[in-house]
């Protein structure tokens, strides 16, 4: 059965949750020690180096072109969602007069900063990613697995690829132009060992979000806060529940997701999310498939078309506001981060309110080029404060 986890008893004030999401009559906490726990979240998944170029015309593949804009930042679904969450934390925090005069809100240095469980790898690219995420207000737990001494890529092995090249994070090169975009990516190639950083995981969080890029990281995040269970009982882990909701960012189907779906409370999927045997699945079929694993809350994004939802027996659509000259890179990730932020603070009783807020934040994200410029927009504070 679906669980309804009330918002934390530390009553969110006007500067924390938009008026349209506030639920002043919700019961005070059932989470143990909730009064003393900062509102925060755990994100788990892929981190890449995103190199983005913008063109003012459709490129000719035979010609060298000059970009009109360029940026470089840490990317990846869970990573961009964590950055969005951190930006909303900063926008919600009361600011001094000096901060108000600054160009953008400072990243949150408090316990509210989201934690990102990921694999950064080694080398200068990894160092850049760590610095970029720190400046964005994201706390990073790097679970990159060590290279075994007998691995073919270990130093001294003849004919092996340089170990350094296999220890570097994935790189995505994105060219955005008026008719769309082109992407070339090395994809995920780092092994992760979350046990290396298990002691640094937050004791309690308000929400957990995983993307579909690393089963070890997903397993560690989804079992955070779960009581110890009888290892001989195959259903014990499914029945043991943490005191927070767990969200799946389902951009596309991955076969390894199947044994973990029973640990998910809310699935936010894209139109490309097509489970086995549902090659051209519609929303009803996807929601029905996930319902078979006990997931009774499903949100399905479809680009500029209305967002669909199926929520504890109800269903509907929420329209998406059209943004002219939209730069859609990372828009879905911004939606997921904003959805997690609102779910953690406002609870789960109003799915349409959660979706409206998340689509509004995603709308801000597409109003400027890249995945970082929009974080300085005053529109974020306006959305947060309702």
Q: Which sequence ranges carry the predicted segments?
A:
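Positively charged, low-complexity intrinsically disordered leader regions
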Residues: 34-60
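Compositionally biased, low-complexity flexible segments
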Residues: 1-33
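Short catalytic helix/loop segments, enriched in acidic residues and glycine
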Residues: 56-78
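Residue-identity detector for glycine
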Residues: 13-15, 33, 156-159, 231
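Conserved N-terminal subdomain of the carbohydrate kinase-like
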Residues: 63-65, 72, 83-207, 382-386
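Conserved phosphate-binding/catalytic region of the ribokinase-like
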Residues: 34-36, 282-386
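Conserved phosphate/ATP/ADP-binding segment of small-molecule kinases
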Residues: 224-317
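Short acidic active-site motifs
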Residues: 193-197, 217, 255-257, 285-286
